[in-house]
Design a protein with these regions (language model features):
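Predominantly extracellular beta-rich ligand-binding scaffolds that present long acidic/polar faces
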Residues: 294, 299-430
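Right-handed parallel beta-helix/beta-spiral solenoid domain characteristic of secreted/periplasmic
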Residues: 136-140, 208-244, 337
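Surface-exposed binding patches on compact interaction domains or structured appendages
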Residues: 7-28, 48-96, 101
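C-terminal motif of bacterial Sec signal peptides marking the signal peptidase cleavage site
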Residues: 3-5
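Feature marks extracellular polysaccharide-active and adherence modules
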Residues: 165, 173, 179, 187, ...
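C-terminal accessory segments
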Residues: 412-474
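Buried hydrophobic-core signal for structured, non-transmembrane domains
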Residues: 40-47, 95, 110-118, 239, ...
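Terminal connector regions
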Residues: 9-10, 101-133
């Protein structure tokens, strides 16, 4: 179907400076289908100029495979040629999408573009629909943080507690924002799929609680379901936590966070002494940037794996950190770039916008941990004298040519001994050989503090280093 208003026809003007205008730059079909169905939206195309314009082609970029169709002059099409819009006139196009939410191969976010070529100019309109029966969190506002624009939708407003359950998956388009003094609690078994460029954002004084279990972890990953994307990093942005508040620690328990850019990004600007994050029984893997990125936070992590990141697995400037029974392993093997950073990079100073250092006290304790990877040195500390820097390693395996067990801060540590991970590229950081030097070499005091490994296997008495106990035949 198409409609024109009645204007006097003019000569077609081929001037490349003349372009079309549209009623929208994105057409959103916001219906969430529970069964096979279709929806229709309207797009208005304007010629605001005093001469006629010829549109050389209008086409769906996705072609025959696109679930979208558009309708002009009563004809449903994927491509139309040589359509004229008279001067100061408009054209109506009707767009339709057909969705089968029961098709497990259907993506959560269905996208295409409607392309217009006029006088050599290519203009596109984004088409967007929801492909499965899920809870969709769609950005409707934008906030500027340090010069970066973050599109967001508030999921937990001030003084509000919002609970996400496992009944249906959550798909985040943009950022799901926790407002100041709001709380988002994510229950066991919840599946969260983040679209490109999106994630979860806890605003200053907000609180995020991820409350999974060993049997039903919370999973946060990208929204592409094709097999090719199972291990593709950088599909979504991050879990970002701004300044926290006293008595409202962020907590992440029994979670799997994979295939993003920064798995967990916690940054304090104003209230470093009140910003706390507690992590347990959690895996952060396959991030194109950092696994855990922290500025002036207090982080305690137990029974955790941070594996295979494009930059450092753990990057921390200032703050207070304690890690118990963690495996930090970087065997990055993706195609974007070669990773030349250390698995753990920590500092008590950073450079400001004028390239001048500013300092903040740093303290870190690592107990019964493994730090290993492909680099010669997988731990690097960058410290200046203007602020305190204290770090201790107790019963840890570390890959390093710079540090050794005779140096201050290292107690009962092993260096440069192959840990024998099952498949570090995959990554699978279980220990699969009785020859591994980490077996039985943990401090029992720390083992008693975390009596079961990431798989629920007891480590009481003779704990291994790292997140997993060795089990013969596993």
């Amino acid at each position: 179907m198409a409609g024109y208003s009645c204007k006097k026809s003019n000569q077609i003007n081929p001037d490349s400076n003349l372009k079309l205008s549209f009623s929208a730059d994105t057409v959103l079909f916001d219906t969430v289908f529970t069964s096979l169905g279709s929806a229709t939206q309207e797009l208005k195309i304007y010629n605001t100029h005093s001469d006629d314009l010829k549109i050389s082609s209008i086409r769906l970029v996705g072609g025959e495979d696109s679930p979208f169709r558009f309708n002009l002059d009563g004809e449903s099409a994927i491509e139309i040629y040589d359509k004229v819009i008279p001067a100061e006139d408009s054209l109506f196009s009707f767009l339709r999408v057909t969705i089968n939410p029961n098709d497990l191969n259907s993506p959560f976010v269905v996208e295409d573009e409607l392309e217009f070529i006029t006088n050599g100019n290519t203009q596109t309109i984004k088409l967007l629909a929801w492909g499965q029966n899920a809870n969709y969190i769609v950005a409707d506002k934008v906030v500027n943080i340090g010069g970066t624009l973050y599109p967001y939708h508030i999921v937990a407003d001030s003084l509000q507690t919002t609970v996400w359950t496992s009944e249906r998956p959550y798909v985040i388009y943009g950022y799901a924002l926790i407002n100041s003094y709001g709380t988002l609690r994510i229950e066991k078994g919840t599946q969260i799929y983040c679209h490109q460029g999106g994630g979860i954002l806890s605003w200053s004084d907000g609180q995020l609680i991820i409350d999974g279990t060993a049997e039903e972890p919370v999973i946060v990953q990208g929204d592409r379901l094709e097999a090719y994307y199972n291990d593709t990093p950088g599909q979504w942005e991050q879990i970002l936590m701004m300044d926290g508040r006293a008595g409202a620690d962020h907590r992440i328990s029994h979670a799997i966070i994979r295939n993003g850019t920064i798995g967990i990004n916690c940054q304090s600007v104003l209230k470093a002494t009140e910003c706390a994050l507690r992590i347990d029984n959690t895996v952060v893997e396959n991030q194109s940037g950092y696994g855990l990125f922290s500025i002036l936070y207090a982080v305690e992590a137990k029974n955790f794996v941070i594996a295979n990141c494009g930059f450092a697995n753990l990057w921390a400037f200032g703050g207070d950190y304690r890690f118990v029974h963690g495996t930090i392993a970087n065997y990055w093997n993706a195609n974007e770039h070669n990773n030349n950073e250390n698995a753990v990079l920590v500092a008590n100073y950073a450079l400001d916008g004028n390239n001048q250092p500013f300092y903040y006290p740093f303290r870190m304790e690592m107990d019964n941990c493994i730090i290993y990877g492909k680099q010669k040195d997988e731990f690097k500390g960058v410290f200046g004298p203007e602020a305190d820097s204290i770090y201790t390693f107790d019963h840890c395996l570390i890959k390093s040519e710079k540090y050794n067990g005779t140096m201050p801060g290292f107690s009962h540590c092993l260096f440069n001994l192959e840990p024998f991970f099952s498949d570090p590229i995959k990554p699978d950081c279980h220990i699969d050989s009785i020859a591994s030097p980490v077996i039985g070499m943990g401090n029992p005091l720390f083992g008693n503090e975390v009596p079961y490994d990431l798989d629920g296997v007891s480590r009481i008495g003779t704990p291994d280093m790292g997140a997993y106990q060795y089990m013969y035949g596993r």
